[in-house]
């Protein structure tokens, strides 16, 4: 769990913002959302494969767009 030390003469809002930023960097909220409901290992693999395929298609489309001639 991220811990911050409130500096001298630091407002509560600034300290809260620093804490939120440290939680975001640690990935705590994403972890909580992922663990909120049980997900079967097959659905995890299926979702990861889908994101992998989407990323690959995006990369290929970007390379093809770069290689097309514009005349």
UniProtKB/Swiss-Prot annotation:
GO cellular component: ribonucleoprotein complex; ribosome
Region (Disordered): 47-71
One Gene Ontology biological process: translation
Keyword Cell inner membrane among UniProt keywords: no
Record keywords: Ribonucleoprotein, Ribosomal protein
UniProt-recorded Gene Ontology molecular function terms: structural constituent of ribosome
InterPro entries reported for this sequence: Ribosomal_bS21, Ribosomal_bS21_CS, Ribosomal_bS21_sf
Highest taxon listed in the record's lineage: Bacteria
Biased composition (Basic and acidic residues): 60-71
Database matches in HAMAP family: Ribosomal_bS21
Family: Belongs to the bacterial ribosomal protein bS21 family.
UniProt-recorded name of the protein: Small ribosomal subunit protein bS21
Species assigned in the record: Actinobacillus succinogenes (strain ATCC 55618 / DSM 22257 / CCUG 43843 / 130Z)
Highest classification ranks of the organism: Bacteria, Pseudomonadati, Pseudomonadota, Gammaproteobacteria, Pasteurellales
Gene: rpsU
């Amino acid at each position: 769990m991220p811990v911050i030390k409130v500096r001298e003469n630091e407002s509560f809002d600034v300290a809260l913002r620093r804490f939120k930023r440290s939680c975001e960097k640690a990935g705590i909220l994403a972890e909580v959302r992922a663990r909120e409901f049980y997900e079967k290992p097959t659905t995890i693999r299926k979702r990861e494969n889908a994101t992998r395929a989407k990323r690959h298609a995006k990369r290929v489309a970007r390379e093809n767009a770069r290689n097309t001639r514009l005349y």
